[in-house]
Amino acid sequence: MSELTTIARPYAKAAFEFAVEHKAVDQWLGMLGFAAQVAENETIHNLVHGSVAAEELANLFVGVCGEQLDEHGQNLIRVMAENGRLGVLPAVLAEFVAFKAELDKEVQADVISAIELTDQQKANIQASLEKRLARKVKLNCSMDASLMAGVLIKAGDLVIDGSVRGKLDRMADALQS
């Protein structure tokens, strides 16, 4: 676990629990998404990592976000500014999204193939993963010719390497040991 994730997780968890309790998960997702974009803005990024006073920085940040943040979202920004943590807002968003996916029983699966997959192949992979993981699966498909043939699937902690490159690497390891 990276240091950024360690710092971001408590803020994301608190925001998520508040959002669930108040049935406002999608609203909070929007607020955090906007705040994370603001935090990534080069000018704001320089101020966040500069020597601006926490209260002044929080007021500036809330001012930039305007009506995109409700009162509770503004409070989160103020707490994060007081603790010098506004720079981790993108990581807070990522953790919040992970908590939401867990609540929705969803998982993002990266499917890397040597060639473009047909819609039928994508549907078959998605159905198989949904059955195996007992979750709704969203596929993120990409191509990598270095795999030679086959697919590499990553879904959470699960990695399925059905590529020729992976098989060759495993054979090479077996021969060397």
Swiss-Prot record:
GO molecular function: any one? proton-transporting ATP synthase activity, rotational mechanism
Q: GO CC annotation: what is one?
A: proton-transporting ATP synthase complex
Q: Which PROSITE patterns match?
A: ATPASE_DELTA
Name where it's found: Cell inner membrane
Q: How does it sit in the membrane?
A: Peripheral membrane protein
Keywords of the record, alphabetical order, are: ATP synthesis, Cell inner membrane, Cell membrane, CF(1), Hydrogen ion transport, Ion transport, Membrane, Transport
For this protein, the record's Pfam families field holds: OSCP
Superkingdom of the source species: Bacteria
Q: Which InterPro entries match?
A: ATP_synth_OSCP/delta_N_sf, ATPase_OSCP/d_CS, ATPase_OSCP/dsu
Q: Which family does it belong to?
A: Belongs to the ATPase delta chain family.
Please give the subunit comment from the record.
Answer: F-type ATPases have 2 components, F(1) - the catalytic core - and F(0) - the membrane proton channel. F(1) has five subunits: alpha(3), beta(3), gamma(1), delta(1), epsilon(1). F(0) has three main subunits: a(1), b(2) and c(10-14). The alpha and beta chains form an alternating ring which encloses part of the gamma chain. F(1) is attached to F(0) by a central stalk formed by the gamma and epsilon chains, while a peripheral stalk is formed by the delta and b chains.
State the HAMAP family in the record. Answer: ATP_synth_delta_bact (MF_01416)
What is the stated purpose of this protein? F(1)F(0) ATP synthase produces ATP from ADP in the presence of a proton or sodium gradient. F-type ATPases consist of two structural domains, F(1) containing the extramembraneous catalytic core and F(0) containing the membrane proton channel, linked together by a central stalk and a peripheral stalk. During catalysis, ATP synthesis in the catalytic domain of F(1) is coupled via a rotary mechanism of the central stalk subunits to proton translocation.
Q: What is this protein called?
A: ATP synthase subunit delta
Specify the species.
Aeromonas salmonicida (strain A449)
UniProt gene name: atpH
